Design a protein with these regions (language model features):
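S-adenosyl-L-methionine
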Residues: 153-167
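Core catalytic lobe of class I
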Residues: 1-151
Length: 167
């Protein structure tokens, strides 16, 4: 999947920088029905997600405040290409594909400066916008599904009453 995405991105003008592997440690499904301890049709599970880092012009960011809020320990740990932490509950968030706040928090602090704008073109439950605003960035999110826009707005208002979101 990552190679396919990178190939398509390059064809439309993006440049590849790197890949981060998120090792989602708490995945519960370990076998598919009918394949338990049988060579007939075992299901191999890979509890990882790829975060493909792409850019358009120059990799080095030259605009913005250049005000960092990442600590030395965060930088050293997060520039390692494998991140391991648990996923998020679908039931708790109310979205079929949630991810924990830690995931966008790391990406936001590693790849943007304080005051930058963070765009999430797949808003979903609002996790990325929530973390952008919580980390002194401007969070902008869009989604084709109005119910997820409403879910994101409600979640952001509930989890951080100081944030404003216009839908």
């Amino acid at each position: 999947m990552g190679a396919d995405l990178t190939t398509i991105a390059k064809k439309i003008g993006w440049k590849y920088h790197s890949t981060i592997i998120w090792n989602e440690g708490n995945i519960s499904r370990r076998t598919a029905w009918g394949s338990w301890m049988s060579a007939s049709a075992p299901y191999v599970i890979a509890p990882v997600e790829l975060i493909v880092i792409l850019y358009k012009k120059d990799w080095k960011k030259i605009n913005g405040t250049k005000l960092n809020d990442i600590t030395r320990d965060e930088f050293m740990g997060w520039t390692n290409g494998v991140w391991t932490f648990n996923g998020e509950s679908k039931k708790r968030i109310g979205h079929p594909a949630p991810f924990p706040r830690e995931l966008p928090r790391r990406c936001i602090k590693l790849f943007s400066f304080v005051g930058d704008t963070v765009l999430d073109p797949f808003l979903g439950s609002g996790t990325t916008v929530l973390e952008a605003c919580s980390n002194n960035r401007i969070g902008v999110g869009v989604d084709v599904d109005r119910k997820y826009c409403a879910l994101a707005k409600q979640r952001i208002e509930t989890e951080n009453s100081q944030l404003l979101l216009k839908v």
